[in-house]
Regions:
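Short, solvent-exposed loop/turn segments at secondary-structure boundaries
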Residues: 57-60, 91-93
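A short glycine-rich, Lys/Arg-flanked "PGG" loop and its adjoining helix->strand segment in the class I
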Residues: 61-74
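Extended basic-aromatic, gly/pro-enriched interface segments that bind polyanionic ligands
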Residues: 1-47, 51-57, 86
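Conserved Class I S-adenosyl-L-methionine
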Residues: 1-20, 85, 89-116
């Protein structure tokens, strides 16, 4: 990583580097078991490198992939490992600038409306 990025983005704490607090504001870091848990919110960016598409069986890869794209906002990004491949073609997803491991969910107005309605239902059910 370029030295400038390290200086601007991280604080050194002993031998470790921590993301500066100004960059953590408004960001939610979640550690979950992809095989069973599904986040309840929508994401702009999902980083899933060298886990699901490397070690899971193909049926489970498809299930996890579907869950990820369901929870990804329209125009959001999924980044997988450089040596990984998605197990299936996803119609609403394109490879970003020809990068085989960076994907963008393309969703027009209909997709955005579906996601908005889904968020509304989730919010209402949480209040019940």
């Amino acid at each position: 990583m370029p030295r400038l990025f390290i200086e601007e983005g991280f604080d050194q704490v002993g031998p470790l580097y921590c993301v500066k607090s100004k960059h953590r504001e408004g960001v939610e870091f979640i550690n979950q078991d992809l095989r069973s848990e599904v986040p309840t919110c929508l994401f702009d960016l999902i980083l899933c490198r060298y886990v699901a598409f490397t070690y899971f069986a193909s049926a489970l890869q498809c299930k996890v992939m579907a869950r990820m794209f369901e929870r990804l906002r329209p125009n959001g990004y999924l980044v997988i490992g450089a040596d990984e491949k998605l197990p299936a073609i996803v119609p609403e997803v394109v490879s970003l600038n020809g990068q085989p491991h960076i994907f963008q969910k393309i969703g027009g107005l209909q997709s955005a409306k579906r996601n908005f309605r889904r968020e509304q239902r989730t919010s209402i059910s949480l209040l019940d």
